[in-house]
UniProtKB/Swiss-Prot annotation:
Residue numbers bearing the N6-acetyllysine modification: K16, K177
Gene name of the record: Rpl13
The organism's taxonomic lineage, starting at the top: Eukaryota, Metazoa, Chordata, Craniata, Vertebrata
Subcellular location: Cytoplasm
One CC-aspect GO term: presynapse
Keywords: Acetylation, Cytoplasm, Isopeptide bond, Phosphoprotein, Ribonucleoprotein, Ribosomal protein, Ubl conjugation
Crosslink (Glycyl lysine isopeptide (Lys-Gly) (interchain with G-Cter in SUMO1)) position: K174
Main location: cytoplasm
The keyword Ribosomal protein is assigned to this record: yes
Phosphoserine PTM positions: S52, S77, S106
Protein name (record): Large ribosomal subunit protein eL13
Length: 211
């Protein structure tokens, strides 16, 4: 039991014939094979649908440490589906993940995911339930012949970094106080309702005094 990181230094008191109870990991190679076989079986079962599952939305990682990166989320919000013109019940049947709990906090995230949905919808090859009687929105017979199973993630998400050229730091940038500005912005957001209420009460008192 070697010490791990910055924890307390242990003084273990072993009893119960502990050498017979050591947890071993000799099943790892077999587990790896079993997982691979399960993935292949699932891919065969759901073919010609994408092997990696439904399309996921672009979401920004939480906290200041990671919010510069984007990754795949759980599901598209109901607002995103509404703007894209896809019904929430239909979405799940055509390989679009839905998360009714998610809320869009910015216009940029909403627009990015709506665009993602529209692009996916344009590329989608939709098989008719009855081959003899295809419905509106189903793909043509020529498109169905071209259909192949996608092995990787559906429309993979990439982090794009823009390189900036080196330049001289301006005086305004030198004097800018980032931490104080963030604190002030948070305080203004927190006290917005209280200040609005006080301003309204003060305005009402002024009206009463004038009377």
């Amino acid at each position: 039991m070697a010490p791990s990181r910055n924890g307390m230094i242990l003084k273990p008191h072993f009893h119960k014939d502990w050498q017979q109870r050591v947890d071993t990991w000799f099943n790892q190679p077999a587990r790896k094979i079993r997982r691979r076989k399960a993935r292949q079986a699932k891919a065969r079962r759901i073919a010609p649908r994408p092997a990696s599952g439904p399309i996921r939305p672009i979401v920004r990682c939480p906290t200041v440490r990671y919010h510069t990166k984007v990754r795949a989320g759980r599901g598209f919000s109901l607002e995103e589906l509404r703007v894209a013109g896809i019904h929430k019940k239909v979405a799940r049947t055509i390989g679009i993940s839905v998360d009714p709990r998610r809320r869009n906090k910015s216009t940029e995230s909403l627009q990015a995911n709506v665009q993602r949905l529209k692009e996916y919808r344009s590329k989608l090859i939709l098989f008719p339930r009855k081959p003899s009687a295809p419905k509106k929105g189903d793909s043509s017979a020529e498109e169905l012949k071209l259909a192949t199973q996608l092995t990787g993630p559906v429309m993979p998400i990439r982090n794009v970094y823009k390189k900036e050229k080196a330049r001289v730091i301006t005086e305004e940038e030198k004097n800018f106080k980032a931490f104080a500005s963030l604190r002030m912005a948070r305080a203004n957001a927190r006290l917005f309702g209280i200040r609005a209420k006080r301003a309204k009460e003060a305005a009402e008192q002024d009206v009463e005094k004038k009377k």
